[in-house]
Amino acid sequence: IFYHYFSRYMPFLSKDKLNAQLPVLKKKFTTYAAFRETKDINDLNPEFAGKAVETKTVNELRSGIFLSMPKGYEFVPFAIEDQSSVIQDIYISPEGTLVYVGNFRHFVSDMGASLANTGRALYGWDQTGKAFSKAGYLPLSVDIDPRKLEQISAGRLILANNSGDLMSIKIPGLNAGNEVQ
C-alpha cells in the first residue's frame, strides 16, 4: 500500500516491516536512503509489474456515522472536535448516547502519534439537524491506547487497551436519559 505524502507516494510500511514480509527486499534495498526513493510497487519488485489486483482511492477521511435511509445510507460526519484523532471503538447505548475512544501512538514514523483526542460522549441525537446536541470529553489520559469499550453497569464502561489492561470509566449521563451531568 502506498500513500500520498508531501507530493510523492511512499510505502505504508517501513523498510524493516516490508523486509520481514518480503525477504527479497533485503538485497534490493540495503540502505534506508535507497528505500526512501521507492515510488510505487514496481520499485519494490519488477515481478509485481502489472499484477496489482486493484487500485483504490479514498475520498472521505472524516469520521462519522451512516444513517439507514429509505433510499440507502447517508453519511453524516462528526463535529470538527471529533476529527482530530483516530476512532478506535464506538459504543452506542440503548438511548442513543454514542461514546468513542481515540488516540493511537504506534503509527509508522512518518505519520507520528495521534494523541489529539482520547474520546468523547455524544448525547441527544437530533434527527432533523442530523447532529448531537451535547458532548463531553472522556476522563482519560492521552498516553493510553484504547481499543475496546463495553458497558459493565449503568453509567460505567470498561475500556481495554493494547497491552490488555482494563480500566473502568464513568460516563456522565450514560443510561440516565440524554442529559449531560
Named regions from a protein language model:
Residues 1-181:
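Acidic, glycine/proline-rich Ca2+-coordinating loop motifs
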